[in-house]
Amino acid sequence: MTDKKRFPIQEVSKIAEKESWRKEINRPIYHIHKWWAQRLGSVFRAILLQLMVDQDTDVWDAFYKIHDFSDVTVLDPFMGSGTTIGEALKLGANAVGCDINPISSFLVQQELTHVPYQELMDTYEMLERKVAPEILSYYKTLDLKSGSEIPVLYY
């Protein structure tokens, strides 16, 4: 149960307001797919912290610190876009989530699966080699002065 007196509502509200303006930029991991009622990561981090830290710990002081709650397991049986699961993992807790909608389960699994950096870059470079020439062919225009075809950089 959360304690209203310990919850840093003023501080979290300021962060949450900014996060809510452009969720897909501020917390892109939870926005790989359109989802109903996406929750703000900053709010859920604060809620989870309040539930996990000692009663005498200031939740706001703990907000930006690195934590190891490996002795805690968080269950979210209605995980939706996975905000609770993602924030619990960031806090070093174990997390278990499920949802009646299989798309939710698939999306959250993809969001939270670690991809080795080199594998990601190799795949990106392969895609660039294979499809970039065709895609770039659609981004050309005629230079009004010279009449020659030039690449379009900005619209």
Where are each of the predicted segments found?
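S-adenosyl-L-methionine-dependent nucleic acid methyltransferase catalytic domains
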Residues: 1-155
